[in-house]
Each structure stands twice: as structure tokens, then as C-alpha cells.
């Protein structure tokens, strides 16, 4: 994997490009800041491969595979003999293997000596550096993060942060020893994990460690800042930005920085300003799971933004007779072919199509958001975009409670109107 730094703006972050994955055509190139597609069990949640290709234009994508979401596939992938990308029929895309699913909350604890716990479908499995690298050789990812201890967040003790940093150094050295000798991983790129919780001195030690081994790393993976899942959207911004800013300033400019989690759009922009290059799509996925359509505006010429909600709850009865698309002007399949009323009906009747349509819209909206980010970085106007997005009316998170389809937040049954039933019959799925 090769990273080319193209532009460093004064106040808006940087532009670059990723390319050089050995097994793909030389035309596979990704402009940064960019997104890695979050997956579960090897697939983008709710979307078939064909729908995903319709959404992305069948171009190569950066695909993120988490260990806790794929560990149950290990024996099957070994039997396939074609690596994880071949097994899940995504050979045309770049595969990135990480330890944790950023959309799933981490289970704290279980810090046994010389192992890292991973919680998959079959429960907890402890990985040593040796067993982890054996799995990596079977999966043969294009890019991967070595085994590390990133189990820290804003509430971690100093002792836990220190153990995280010390254990990570040991794991990484053991993994690199295997990597250097492996014939199966000759074309794979490795990301250096930066850990240490919210302790600047430990983060500095972590940076110094990966810099001693800089020839082994194609980029850097900043971890241990939240507990994944919705915690990334609720994290205290100031301490996180302080740590990320400090880390990015210490790392070399010429290599990409990865930071995953379901961060709010505002926090994503602040992280871009501080030098983070690559994020993931766990945020639109979690919004889909909450039955919400992304609605925030990234067009700074939109004067109606102060009256605009950042997202729409499509199970809310107020949409029962709204026969317009999710977002005015959106050109995604869901918005051009379907309506809020129809999708509201689908949620009421618990149809599988409801989250499919919502995921199509949310991914499209998020990809368009990142196109806007790249434009603003090029013009050095990300600050204007941050101010614009901060003007939105923020829809309450409802204390993390996901509303049951067909009911309001207080549990009252939502009944369909006759017009919705007519619309449901009229629309072709």
C-alpha cells in the first residue's frame, strides 16, 4: 500500500491518495480523507453485493473486516484457500483486517497474560500473537493491524493505560517477527497501532516504538480512545482531539493515519483538521439500526440549515403521509424511488426492505459528505463546513434506546392510514 500526500492546507487538514495494492490493478486509487466500508460477517450490513455495486459504481472499495465478526469463519476460509476476500466474494476490493468491530461495544476486562480476548458469535476466544498471525496467514488481508491491547477509553485507570502500551509493544514485535518470515503475507501492508489511552506520555512512548520499526509500517492505526459502538458518538471531544492532535504531530507526514469509530460528523471534521486520513462507515450503520435517515446538510450555501434536523426517525408517525424522499435533492436509490411514508409503513410491518432502503440512503449521504470534505480541504474551508453543520437542529438520541418498529417511544401502537396502504401497493420494490 502506497500513500501519496498531495496537499497540506493551513487550517483544514490534508489531501492524499492510497494505491499500490499488489494484487489489484494499478488503477485502484482512493482519494483521502476517505472511508473504509464497515462489514459484518464479510458483508456490508443489509446490502447484497449487487446493491453495494449499484451504490458505489462497482469500483474497488476499501473493505474493513473485524476479527470478532469473522473469527467464526477461520476454518472455512482455510479450506477455501483463497483468503478472506475470495471467501466473501470481494476479491476486487482492498481488504483491511482489524481486531474490533467499531459498531459493537467492547466487553472490558479479561486481560490475561500474553493474550487478547476477542468476542465472536461463539463467545470469547483468546488470541496469542502466534495464533493471531496463523489466522492472518489464512485470511491474507491486503492491510492488517497486528495484535494489540487497545482496551482503554476516557475512564481507564493509569495502570490500565500503561498495561495497554506495554502489552502492545510485546504483541507487535512478536507479530512482525512472523510477518517478516511469512511467504503468504509478502504483499500485505501493516499498520502500526498507537495506544496509551488518554495519557500523553504513554502515547508518546507508543509513537516512539512504532517509529523505531517504521520500515515495517505502511501507516498508523490510532486506537484506545473509546469503547466502540455508540460510545464514539458520545465521547468528550476536547480530550480526544487533544490526544489525536498530539499523536498526529509526532507521526511522519508521509504515512496515512487511520481512526475508526462512529464519530459524529462534527467530530469527523475536527479529526480531519488534525490530520486523520481514513475513517469507517460504522456511523451510518448505527443510524440505520436506530431507524434514522441522515439529513445533515454539507452544502454551506443552504440558508435553511437552522431549521433542519440532522437526522429523521422514520418510525415516527409524523411521516405516515409524507410522500417525498428522505432528503430533498438526494439522488440515492431510496430517495428517488421511495418515500418517507412507504418506509414508515415498512417499519410498521417489520419488512426487511426498511433497513435496506435506509442503509442505501445513509451510506450514499455519508459518501457525499466525504466528497464535500475533500472539496473543503482543497479550498482550506473546513472551518466553514464545521460552523454550517453545527447550526442543525439535533434530534435527541433517546438515551440509546432503539425504538421498536411500529411503536412510538412510549410504546403506543402506530396505525397506518389508508393512504399509506395505497402507497405501499403502488410503489414497486
From Swiss-Prot:
Note accompanying the cofactor annotation: Binds 1 zinc ion per subunit.
UniProt subcellular location: Cytoplasm
GO CC annotations, alphabetized: cytoplasm
Keywords: Cytoplasm, Metal-binding, tRNA processing, Zinc
GO biological process: tRNA-guanine transglycosylation
Cofactor: Zn(2+)
TM ranges: none
Chain positions recorded as Zn(2+) binding sites: 330, 332, 335, 361
Listed Pfam families: TGT
Location, primary (coarse class): cytoplasm
Gene Ontology terms for molecular function: metal ion binding; tRNA-guanosine(34) queuine transglycosylase activity
Keyword Cell cycle found: no
HAMAP family (UniProt xref): QTRT2
Homology family: Belongs to the queuine tRNA-ribosyltransferase family. QTRT2 subfamily.
PANTHER family: QUEUINE TRNA-RIBOSYLTRANSFERASE ACCESSORY SUBUNIT 2
Biological function: Non-catalytic subunit of the queuine tRNA-ribosyltransferase (TGT) that catalyzes the base-exchange of a guanine (G) residue with queuine (Q) at position 34 (anticodon wobble position) in tRNAs with GU(N) anticodons (tRNA-Asp, -Asn, -His and -Tyr), resulting in the hypermodified nucleoside queuosine (7-(((4,5-cis-dihydroxy-2-cyclopenten-1-yl)amino)methyl)-7-deazaguanosine).
Complex formation: Heterodimer of a catalytic subunit and an accessory subunit.
Name of the molecule in the record: Queuine tRNA-ribosyltransferase accessory subunit 2
Organism per entry: Culex quinquefasciatus
Taxonomic classification: Eukaryota, Metazoa, Ecdysozoa, Arthropoda, Hexapoda
Amino acid at each position: 500500500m502506497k500513500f501519496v500526500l498531495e496537499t497540506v492546507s493551513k487550517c483544514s487538514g490534508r489531501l492524499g491518495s492510497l494505491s499500490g495494492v499488489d494484487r489489484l490493478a494499478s488503477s485502484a486509487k482512493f482519494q483521502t480523507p476517505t472511508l473504509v466500508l464497515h462489514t459484518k460477517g464479510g458483508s456490508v450490513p443489509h446490502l447484497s453485493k449487487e446493491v453495494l455495486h449499484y451504490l458505489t459504481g462497482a469500483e474497488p472499495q476499501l473493505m474493513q473486516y473485524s476479527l470478532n465478526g469473522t473469527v467464526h469463519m477461520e476454518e472455512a476460509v482455510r479450506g477455501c484457500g483463497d483468503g478472506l476476500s475470495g471467501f466473501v466474494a470481494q476479491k476486487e476490493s482492498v481488504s483491511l483486517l482489524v481486531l474490533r468491530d467499531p459498531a459493537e461495544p467492547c466487553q472490558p476486562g479479561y486481560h490475561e497474560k500474553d493474550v487478547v480476548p476477542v468476542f465472536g458469535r461463539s463467545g470469547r476466544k483468546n488470541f496469542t500473537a502466534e495464533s493471531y498471525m496463523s489466522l492472518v496467514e489464512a485470511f491474507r488481508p491486503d492491510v492488517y493491524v497486528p495484535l494489540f491491547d487497545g482496551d482503554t477509553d476516557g475512564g481507564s485507570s493509569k495502570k490500565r493505560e500503561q498495561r495497554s502500551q506495554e502489552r502492545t509493544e510485546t504483541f507487535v514485535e512478536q507479530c512482525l517477527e512472523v510477518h517478516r518470515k511469512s511467504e503468504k503475507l509478502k504483499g500485505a501492508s501493516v499498520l502500526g497501532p498507537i495506544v496509551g489511552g488518554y495519557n500523553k506520555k504513554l502515547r508518546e512512548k507508543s509513537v516512539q516504538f512504532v517509529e523505531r520499526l517504521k520500515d515495517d509500517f505502511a501507516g498508523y492505526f490510532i486506537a484506545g480512545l473509546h469503547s466502540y459502538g455508540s460510545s464514539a458518538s458520545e465521547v468528550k471531544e476536547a480530550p480526544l482531539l487533544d490526544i489525536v492532535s498530539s499523536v498526529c504531530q509526532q507521526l511522519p507526514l508521509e504515512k496515512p493515519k487511520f481512526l475508526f469509530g462512529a464519530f459524529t460528523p462534527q467530530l469527523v471534521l475536527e479529526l480531519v483538521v488534525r490530520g486523520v486520513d481514513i475513517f469507517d462507515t460504522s456511523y451510518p450503520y448505527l443510524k440505520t439500526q436506530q431507524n434514522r435517515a441522515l439529513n445533515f446538510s454539507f452544502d454551506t450555501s443552504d440558508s435553511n440549515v437552522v431549521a433542519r434536523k440532522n437526522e429523521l426517525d422514520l418510525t415516527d408517525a409524523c411521516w405516515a403521509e409524507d410522500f417525498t424522499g428522505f432528503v430533498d435533492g438526494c439522488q440515492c436509490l431510496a430517495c428517488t424511488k421511495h418515500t418517507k411514508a412507504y418506509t414508515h409503513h415498512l417499519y410498521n410491518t417489520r419488512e426487511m426492505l426498511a433497513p435496506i432502503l435506509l442503509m442505501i440512503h445513509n451510506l450514499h449521504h455519508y459518501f457525499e459528505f466525504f466528497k464535500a470534505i475533500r472539496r473543503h480541504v482543497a479550498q482550506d474551508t473546513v472551518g466553514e463546513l464545521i460552523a454550517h453543520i453545527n447550526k442543525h437542529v439535533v434530534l435527541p438520541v433517546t438515551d440509546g434506546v432503539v425504538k421498536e418498529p411500529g411503536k412510538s417511544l412510549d410504546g403506543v401502537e402506530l396505525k397506518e392510514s389508508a393512504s399509506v396502504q395505497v402507497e405501499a401497493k403502488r410503489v414497486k420494490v
